[in-house]
A protein has these predicted regions:
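Substrate-recognition "cap/lid" segment bordering the active-site pocket of phosphatases
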Residues: 127, 133-184, 192
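A metal-dependent, Asp-based hydrolase signature
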Residues: 48-97
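Active-site neighborhood of HAD-like aspartate-dependent phosphohydrolases
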Residues: 1-54
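Glycine-rich phosphate-binding loop signature in dinucleotide/nucleotide-binding domains
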Residues: 2-4, 122-124, 176-180
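A generic "structured core" feature
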Residues: 14, 22-24, 105-109, 147, ...
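Short, acidic loop-to-helix structural element flanking the phosphoryl-transfer center
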Residues: 85-90, 94-127
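Short glycine/proline-centered loop/turn elements that form peptide/ligand docking sites
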Residues: 17, 86, 113-114, 169, ...
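Acidic, Mg2+-coordinating phosphoryl-transfer loop and its flanking beta/alpha structural elements
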Residues: 184-207
Length: 207
């Protein structure tokens, strides 16, 4: 199939709709200048995300006591650092959700966004599937209208498992009422989005 022959495009966010490398570089400069006290928390938070993914891939279930993997990641970080989870959440939301917005818009993948708009204009169905909260970032990109469905960790309709588990993409297809075989997953990580797509019996396009 060519891209236009799919009924739905299911799209990753971070590193896919914008160039993550440049956003991270800009945020690293901001952290050094204005947020040194947050660096330890953010480093541990990112470590816990990859640790959770590795545990999940090894067949160990993520803790079911949390509302979402995102909530579990916050709790694990707080436990490791010996601080209240509310402190961790405040730092994470400020430095990973809110402040990057101004840079995300500048480094948007404009060609891909134009393709998405064209696909939707032709009647295609679209979903955003993310391992992190997405609402603020899609507003920064100005692309909310592009997506029929948003499936984001830590938000309503969010998955209970992280990629490469296919749950998020399968849930998006279900909400769109499109069969998995008619879906194209678009993402920047073959080891996460690609593996999830293959497990869901969907096609995959690496950006």
């Amino acid at each position: 199939m060519t891209d236009a022959q799919y009924d739905a495009w299911l799209v990753d966010l971070d590193g896919t709709l914008y160039t993550q490398r440049w956003v991270r570089l800009a945020m690293a400069v901001e952290l050094v200048l204005f947020g040194r006290s947050a660096i330890k928390t953010l480093r541990q938070f990112r470590h816990e995300h990859e640790a959770m993914r590795e545990e999940q891939n090894a067949g160990r279930a993520l803790a079911a006591t949390h509302a979402s993997p995102f909530a579990g990641q916050l709790a694990r970080t707080a436990e490791k650092l010996g601080v209240p989870v509310t402190d961790v959440e405040r730092v994470v939301r400020r430095w990973m959700v809110e402040r990057p917005g101004k840079w995300i818009g500048r480094f948007a993948r404009k060609t891909l966004l134009a393709e998405l708009r064209a696909f939707k204009a032709q009647g295609g169905r679209t979903a955003l599937v993310s391992d992190y909260p997405a609402e603020r970032k899609i507003d920064a990109l100005g692309v909310r209208a592009i997506f029929d469905v948003i499936v984001a960790n830590g938000e309503a309709n969010g998955p209970r498992r992280l990629k490469p588990d296919p749950e998020g993409y399968l849930h998006a297809a279900e909400l769109l009422k499109v069969q998995p075989g008619r879906c194209l997953v678009i993402g920047d990580r073959d080891d996460a989005d690609g593996e999830a797509a293959r497990a869901a019996k969907m096609s995959f396009r690496l950006v």
